[in-house]
Amino acid sequence: MGVESTYNWYWLVDGLMDAGYRLHLANPAAIQQYNGLKYTDDHSDARWLAHLLRFGVLPEGYIYPKAQRPIRDLLRKRAHLVEQQTANVLSVQNIILRNTGARLSANRIKSMSQAEVHALLPDADQALAVSSALTVLHCLAEQIKTVETRVRTRLHRTPLYELLQTVDGIGPILAQTILRETGDMRRFPTVGD
Protein backbone atom coordinates (compact mmCIF):
# COMPACT_ATOMS: atom_id res chain seq x y z
CA MET A 1 0.00 0.00 0.00
CA GLY A 2 1.32 3.43 -0.91
CA VAL A 3 0.80 6.62 1.08
CA GLU A 4 1.87 10.06 -0.12
CA SER A 5 4.33 11.75 2.22
CA THR A 6 2.61 14.92 3.35
CA TYR A 7 3.20 17.00 6.46
CA ASN A 8 0.80 14.83 8.49
CA TRP A 9 1.44 11.26 7.38
CA TYR A 10 2.56 9.89 10.77
CA TRP A 11 -0.84 8.96 12.16
CA LEU A 12 -2.01 7.24 8.97
CA VAL A 13 1.17 5.26 8.36
CA ASP A 14 1.46 4.28 12.03
CA GLY A 15 -2.15 3.09 12.14
CA LEU A 16 -1.85 1.06 8.96
CA MET A 17 1.46 -0.48 10.02
CA ASP A 18 0.00 -1.33 13.43
CA ALA A 19 -2.83 -3.08 11.57
CA GLY A 20 -0.28 -5.21 9.71
CA TYR A 21 -0.09 -3.45 6.34
CA ARG A 22 3.19 -3.16 4.44
CA LEU A 23 3.59 0.51 3.57
CA HIS A 24 5.45 2.46 0.90
CA LEU A 25 5.83 6.15 1.64
CA ALA A 26 5.67 7.99 -1.70
CA ASN A 27 8.10 10.88 -2.06
CA PRO A 28 6.07 13.54 -3.91
CA ALA A 29 9.14 15.67 -4.67
CA ALA A 30 10.62 12.81 -6.71
CA ILE A 31 7.43 11.83 -8.56
CA GLN A 32 6.93 13.05 -12.10
CA GLN A 33 3.28 13.81 -12.72
CA TYR A 34 1.78 12.12 -15.76
CA ASN A 35 1.55 14.76 -18.51
CA GLY A 36 -1.63 13.33 -20.05
CA LEU A 37 -3.79 14.07 -17.02
CA LYS A 38 -6.40 16.72 -17.80
CA TYR A 39 -7.11 17.37 -14.13
CA THR A 40 -5.81 16.15 -10.82
CA ASP A 41 -7.42 15.57 -7.50
CA ASP A 42 -6.83 13.18 -4.63
CA HIS A 43 -8.49 10.30 -6.51
CA SER A 44 -6.43 10.71 -9.68
CA ASP A 45 -3.26 11.20 -7.60
CA ALA A 46 -4.03 7.99 -5.69
CA ARG A 47 -4.54 6.07 -8.95
CA TRP A 48 -1.25 7.43 -10.31
CA LEU A 49 0.64 6.43 -7.13
CA ALA A 50 -0.96 2.96 -7.31
CA HIS A 51 0.26 2.55 -10.91
CA LEU A 52 3.79 3.60 -9.96
CA LEU A 53 3.77 1.19 -7.01
CA ARG A 54 2.39 -1.67 -9.11
CA PHE A 55 5.12 -1.16 -11.74
CA GLY A 56 7.80 -0.97 -9.03
CA VAL A 57 8.89 2.59 -9.86
CA LEU A 58 7.37 4.54 -6.97
CA PRO A 59 10.00 6.91 -5.52
CA GLU A 60 9.89 6.27 -1.81
CA GLY A 61 10.67 8.23 1.30
CA TYR A 62 12.00 6.74 4.50
CA ILE A 63 9.51 5.79 7.19
CA TYR A 64 11.37 7.00 10.23
CA PRO A 65 10.85 4.63 13.18
CA LYS A 66 7.88 5.68 15.30
CA ALA A 67 9.76 5.34 18.59
CA GLN A 68 12.53 7.69 17.42
CA ARG A 69 10.35 10.45 15.95
CA PRO A 70 9.58 12.31 19.22
CA ILE A 71 13.24 13.06 20.02
CA ARG A 72 13.94 13.99 16.38
CA ASP A 73 10.93 16.31 16.42
CA LEU A 74 12.13 17.79 19.72
CA LEU A 75 15.51 18.50 18.13
CA ARG A 76 13.71 20.13 15.21
CA LYS A 77 11.79 22.28 17.69
CA ARG A 78 15.10 23.28 19.27
CA ALA A 79 16.45 24.30 15.85
CA HIS A 80 13.33 26.39 15.30
CA LEU A 81 13.74 28.08 18.70
CA VAL A 82 17.39 28.84 17.90
CA GLU A 83 16.31 30.39 14.57
CA GLN A 84 13.81 32.58 16.42
CA GLN A 85 16.47 33.55 18.93
CA THR A 86 18.83 34.55 16.13
CA ALA A 87 16.10 36.60 14.42
CA ASN A 88 15.44 38.47 17.68
CA VAL A 89 19.13 39.17 18.25
CA LEU A 90 19.45 40.52 14.69
CA SER A 91 16.38 42.68 15.21
CA VAL A 92 17.83 44.21 18.39
CA GLN A 93 21.22 44.70 16.73
CA ASN A 94 19.55 46.54 13.85
CA ILE A 95 17.47 48.79 16.11
CA ILE A 96 20.53 49.75 18.13
CA LEU A 97 22.75 50.21 15.08
CA ARG A 98 20.19 52.38 13.25
CA ASN A 99 19.56 54.59 16.25
CA THR A 100 22.96 54.82 17.91
CA GLY A 101 25.54 53.59 15.43
CA ALA A 102 26.74 51.07 18.04
CA ARG A 103 27.47 47.50 16.98
CA LEU A 104 26.77 45.10 19.83
CA SER A 105 27.62 41.40 19.82
CA ALA A 106 24.93 38.77 20.28
CA ASN A 107 26.34 37.90 23.70
CA ARG A 108 26.28 41.55 24.74
CA ILE A 109 22.67 41.90 23.65
CA LYS A 110 21.60 38.74 25.47
CA SER A 111 23.10 40.07 28.71
CA MET A 112 21.64 43.61 28.53
CA SER A 113 19.59 44.83 31.47
CA GLN A 114 16.52 47.04 31.14
CA ALA A 115 18.50 49.93 32.63
CA GLU A 116 21.18 49.50 29.95
CA VAL A 117 18.51 49.49 27.23
CA HIS A 118 17.02 52.76 28.48
CA ALA A 119 20.47 54.35 28.85
CA LEU A 120 21.38 53.34 25.30
CA LEU A 121 18.00 54.25 23.77
CA PRO A 122 16.46 57.28 25.49
CA ASP A 123 13.44 57.20 23.17
CA ALA A 124 10.72 55.28 25.04
CA ASP A 125 9.32 53.58 21.93
CA GLN A 126 12.71 52.33 20.77
CA ALA A 127 13.55 51.15 24.27
CA LEU A 128 10.23 49.30 24.45
CA ALA A 129 10.92 47.58 21.11
CA VAL A 130 14.29 46.36 22.38
CA SER A 131 12.95 45.45 25.83
CA SER A 132 10.19 43.38 24.24
CA ALA A 133 12.70 41.56 22.06
CA LEU A 134 14.95 40.93 25.07
CA THR A 135 12.02 39.45 27.01
CA VAL A 136 11.35 37.08 24.11
CA LEU A 137 15.08 36.28 23.89
CA HIS A 138 15.21 35.30 27.55
CA CYS A 139 12.15 33.09 27.15
CA LEU A 140 13.64 31.43 24.06
CA ALA A 141 16.95 30.85 25.85
CA GLU A 142 15.10 29.21 28.73
CA GLN A 143 13.14 26.95 26.39
CA ILE A 144 16.23 25.99 24.39
CA LYS A 145 17.94 25.04 27.65
CA THR A 146 14.89 22.99 28.71
CA VAL A 147 14.85 21.13 25.39
CA GLU A 148 18.60 20.50 25.51
CA THR A 149 18.33 19.16 29.06
CA ARG A 150 15.64 16.72 27.91
CA VAL A 151 17.65 15.67 24.85
CA ARG A 152 20.72 15.01 27.01
CA THR A 153 18.70 12.54 29.08
CA ARG A 154 17.85 10.63 25.89
CA LEU A 155 21.32 10.47 24.33
CA HIS A 156 22.43 7.17 22.90
CA ARG A 157 26.19 7.05 23.06
CA THR A 158 26.94 5.03 19.94
CA PRO A 159 30.34 4.88 18.24
CA LEU A 160 28.98 7.11 15.44
CA TYR A 161 27.75 9.64 18.02
CA GLU A 162 31.21 9.74 19.59
CA LEU A 163 32.89 9.97 16.16
CA LEU A 164 30.74 12.93 15.12
CA GLN A 165 31.88 14.86 18.18
CA THR A 166 35.51 14.61 17.06
CA VAL A 167 34.65 17.15 14.34
CA ASP A 168 35.33 20.72 15.45
CA GLY A 169 32.08 22.52 16.25
CA ILE A 170 29.97 19.40 16.72
CA GLY A 171 28.94 18.89 20.32
CA PRO A 172 26.43 16.55 21.95
CA ILE A 173 23.28 18.32 20.72
CA LEU A 174 24.42 18.81 17.12
CA ALA A 175 25.75 15.23 16.95
CA GLN A 176 22.37 13.96 18.15
CA THR A 177 20.60 16.20 15.61
CA ILE A 178 22.70 14.86 12.74
CA LEU A 179 22.09 11.27 13.81
CA ARG A 180 18.34 11.81 14.19
CA GLU A 181 18.02 13.58 10.84
CA THR A 182 20.01 11.03 8.85
CA GLY A 183 18.53 7.98 10.53
CA ASP A 184 19.95 4.52 9.98
CA MET A 185 22.55 4.84 7.22
CA ARG A 186 22.28 1.12 6.43
CA ARG A 187 19.13 1.93 4.47
CA PHE A 188 21.39 3.28 1.71
CA PRO A 189 22.82 0.26 -0.13
CA THR A 190 25.50 2.27 -1.94
CA VAL A 191 27.14 5.67 -1.86
CA GLY A 192 24.94 8.21 -3.63
CA ASP A 193 21.60 6.55 -2.79
Predicted regions and their residues:
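Histidine-centered phosphotransfer motif of kinases
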Residues: 167
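Glycine-rich, often acidic, oxyanion-interacting loops/wings at catalytic, nucleic-acid
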Residues: 75-163
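Generic alpha-helical structural context detector
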Residues: 50-51, 94-97, 180, 193
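Catalytic palm subdomain of template-directed nucleic-acid polymerases
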Residues: 176-190
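Short glycine-rich phosphate-binding loop at a beta-alpha junction
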Residues: 1-6
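Short alpha-helix plus adjacent loop in nuclease-associated cores
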Residues: 17, 24-76, 80, 115-119
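Short, well-ordered alpha-helical microsegments
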Residues: 9-13
